[in-house]
Amino acid sequence: MTETTRESHLTLHRGGFPAGVTKVLSLGDTRFVDIAFYMVKLEPNTTQEVPPVFHQCAAIVLGGNGRVTLCPKRGEELPAVEVSRADLFTEPPHSFLLPRGAGMKLAAGDRGLELALCSVPGQGQAKPVHVPPDQVRCEERGEGQLAGTFHRQVRTVADSSNAKGWGFVFGEVVNQAGRWSSYPPHHHPQPELYYYRFDKPQGYGHAEIGEQVVKVRAHDFTLMREGEDHAQVSAPGYAMWYLWVIRNLKDQVYDTPEFTEEHRWLLSAK
């Protein structure tokens, strides 16, 4: 395995995450993405406080049920939001955007509660924001093209259309078994992080990161440098889900990807 592959493919958490807060990446851990990632996992009927964040942060509910209370600043609380998510593959998430200095109080219900926290440098907007599932933009991409071999569902939670002024764009992809996503291969000037889950414990897929190809399993991460081509495929029999987070550059907010020239013909292929 090359040094580039070790930096771009993280596999330390394949056994899953324990209760509590687990740091996967902090800002500055990698030389090229500068995206922090923490997993927050609560046992049923327990609580957890997320103290005021030092940089703007996105919190995405991955599973369970409970209440999320946003705290714009110390001593101030917004009304609690009831959240629930039974299945990554069929339900869009509740998500929360936290500016610098804001925090959260979490109270798990009878199914526990699990959230991903993703942070990038900067302030963000002035106030925290809740993006409920019915405001997530869900698109069926690649449907009806090349026998559905790259048909997938893309869920965009936050981008320039609804989260202007934030330092990130993020969402999810549901990759059907045996099919491609993030396809045709593409790149963009902004760095990106993927976090993976599968519908079966033994599920797996493959990720292209530039000229490297890696085998991905549940709880793996891949990291894409600025301008680095990437695409994904899930093994037959195993549906794949992944969270994607793009860090906006100071003078270049992510809008659309740039597809690799030799594969652009696939955009209109039947």
Predicted features along the sequence, with ranges:
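Conserved metal-binding segment of the jelly-roll/cupin
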Residues: 89-109, 120, 215-237, 243-247
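Non-transmembrane, aqueous-exposed alpha-helical and coiled segments at domain scale
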Residues: 2, 10, 14-18
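Extended, compositionally biased flexible segments
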Residues: 29, 37-108
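Glycine- and acidic-residue-biased ligand/ion/polar-headgroup-sensing regions
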Residues: 53-78, 177-178, 183, 189-221, ...
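Short, structured patches in soluble enzyme cores that scaffold and shape functional sites
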Residues: 100, 108-110, 117-122, 158, ...
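Conserved hydrophobic/aromatic beta-strand scaffold that supports enzyme active sites
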Residues: 37-41, 58, 95-97, 117, ...
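A short glycine-rich, His/Asp/Glu-containing loop-to-beta-strand
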Residues: 15-49, 56, 145-192
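Double-stranded beta-helix
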Residues: 87, 111-153, 208, 243-270
